[in-house]
């Protein structure tokens, strides 16, 4: 069982696509995309993804990727 990272298509258009593609190449992470994750306020303010249901944000695609991996490392129990 891998950690699940979910992306909103609107947020991917803002730079989240870079993070999505990086994670998609990681066999230890499951990546999903949705039309909307219903976090419109956060989505309009910047980059974010849901990591096992938790909101993880970043000011740049690189920072978001770094924060996602940090969150997985801190919270993943498998």
From Swiss-Prot:
InterPro entries: DUF1450, UPF0349
Family: Belongs to the UPF0349 family.
Protein name in the entry: UPF0349 protein SAOUHSC_00876
Phylogenetic lineage: Bacteria, Bacillati, Bacillota, Bacilli, Bacillales
